[in-house]
Amino acid sequence: MGLFDERVAYKPFEYPEYYTEGWLKQAQAFWLHTEISMQSDIKDWNEKLDDKEKHLVGNILLGFAQTECAVSDYWTQKVVGWFPKHEIQQMAMMFGSQETIHAVAYSYLNETLKLEDYEAFLHEPATAERFDNLVAYDGNNPIGIAKSLAVFSAFAEGVSLYSAFAVLYSFQLRNLLKGIGQQMKWSVRDESLHSKMGCKLFRDMCNENGQLLNLCREDIIKAAETMIKLETKYIDKMFEAGDIEGISANDLKHFIKKRTNEKLVELGYVDLGSYFAYDAKAAGNLDWFYHLTGGVTHTDFFATRPTDYSKAGEGEDFEDIW
């Protein structure tokens, strides 16, 4: 039986890794915004951040709160509807549920910092629509499903907004905004898991249909190019008032290109690992992002580390690190 063949019995699982590496790891990684103390963040916001930094952080956070619902719907409606296997469906439902936790948590940050006077940084509408069209497949054709799943998993979950995650997390380098930093750490780990397992699901589809990888290639490359354009414009928007201490727009652009290459390889296009030319030194200036969020360069977190990070007292003392 294949991925699209219904199995009435709950077990035995035919694809057990979607339970062990997907559902179980996400369940073990459960967290809530109520675990995050924001007292020091409020003090930092009122006393230590300048107006340019407040503009940047406030607009990023407002934008985040508007993006999570669509991601949740993709997992709980599209993926659950396409794949009848229990182990895949329950993983997708768990992922979708976790995205609602993100939405609530971002809203909590916005309310705590009183960000109602800021305008959300969002992806440029025309380019975003082109990308959304590549994800918005609703039919039952395996080629359409594969394209949509690949683009969503690799780029929507694995690249989109990572520049914003890095900007917010960069304040940890200065021992500021620890509550926001803790939430970014947990959010990045969740997104890394979602992207990793979605890419695996695409590869498994390709393993069962030898033509899929090649049939999807052109549209996936097109989506990668569109994502680079989206993130580049988004970075320009974030840094319209100039760079901030600890991070630069130029480094972020190369970081995103490198990450997009890595996701193309993770989908199975091993020959596209250098598709987008990037400055290795500039991209390497963001290696601290992988270190502080618990991952390692070239490898998403869940591939290499345990997942017991849901405890409220887990936070590091960044003065000790830096």
Short names for language-model regions:
Residues 1-322:
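Non-heme di-metal
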